[in-house]
Design a protein with these regions (language model features):
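Short, small-residue-biased leader/transition segments that mark boundaries at the very start
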Residues: 1-5
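A short, well-ordered alpha-helix in the C-terminal region of glycosyltransferases
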Residues: 53, 190, 197, 204-219, ...
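Nucleotide-activated donor-binding/catalytic signature segment of Leloir-type glycosyltransferases, i.e.
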Residues: 108-124
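Aromatic "clamp/platform" in nucleotide-sugar-dependent glycosyltransferases that forms part
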Residues: 125, 144
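Short hydrophobic beta-strand element within catalytic cores of glycosyltransferases
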Residues: 161-164, 174
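Conserved acidic donor-binding segment of nucleotide-sugar-dependent glycosyltransferases
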Residues: 176-177, 181-188, 197-202
């Protein structure tokens, strides 16, 4: 048993995560095993409940989704402002914001200040995330920093069009104008332009969504990830 304790392997979910660990903690033995997604649960071709109807969206609405903690890291105020800006150019833009956090009240106040109460629907965290993702047209992750967002991977598995910021983990999985659109940090006006681009170029929404879904199927299948973790354990115990 003593030999087991002498061997260490730190599992990191992204290459940027591993590099940060090396710089911050001096990690000597580390390996990257990316997060896994349950592709049976997050399958865009299965049946879903009609959350668009529950939240009051019509078939004509183009719904932008935000799913995550409502904290400074996730830049919810940028998201709210981006929706207001996009609606100045196309009234079909609506939004669904799902999450909780220490900026909840500030975010709701921003929604009121922009006059978006009827156009940005909010909800606390929900257990039916696949249904939430099915209900939206575009998934937005405007984070200021990020490791590797599980919510992003789930949206990719659901074949969603993506608008993201270039955080370290995100850049490892999203290629600009191939599997999503990447905009700079703190630029709600650029987020807005991306929503409108997807609305006016539906082929981008479809093509980028397919590419994102393929990335998940190839790299982030939970069964594949479980096998990789098991192999690490076996190597340590040998």
């Amino acid at each position: 048993l003593g030999d087991v304790y002498k061997r260490q392997e730190v599992i990191c979910v992204s290459e940027s995560n591993r590099i940060t660990g090396q710089k911050t903690f001096g990690l000597k033995h580390s390996i990257v095993i990316e997060n896994g997604i349950n592709l049976t649960k997050f399958n865009p071709h299965r049946e879903f409940s009609n959350l668009r109807n529950e939240f009051g969206f019509t078939d004509e609405d183009f719904v932008i989704g935000f799913v995550g903690r409502i904290t400074l890291q996730k830049a919810p105020l940028d998201f709210v402002k981006s929706i207001a800006l996009a609606r100045q150019k196309d009234k079909r833009i609506k939004a669904l914001l799902v999450g909780q956090g220490d900026m909840e009240e500030e975010t709701k106040e921003a929604i009121r200040l922009y006059g978006m109460e009827k156009h940005i629907r909010t909800s606390p965290f929900r257990s039916d995330v696949p249904d939430v993702l099915h209900a939206i047209d575009v998934f937005c992750l405007p984070s200021l920093w990020e490791g590797l967002s599980i919510a992003l991977l789930e949206a990719m598995a659901m074949k969603k069009a993506l608008v993201v910021t270039p955080t370290d983990g995100t850049k490892e999985v999203i290629t600009h104008q191939q599997s999503g659109l990447i905009v700079d940090f703190g630029k709600p006006e650029e987020l807005a332009e991306c929503y409108l681009a997807y609305l006016h170029h539906p082929e981008w929404k479809e093509d980028y969504g397919v590419t994102a879904m393929s990335t998940i199927q190839e790299r982030f299948n939970s069964r594949r990830v479980s096998q990789q973790v098991t192999e690490v354990y076996y190597d340590i115990l040998r």
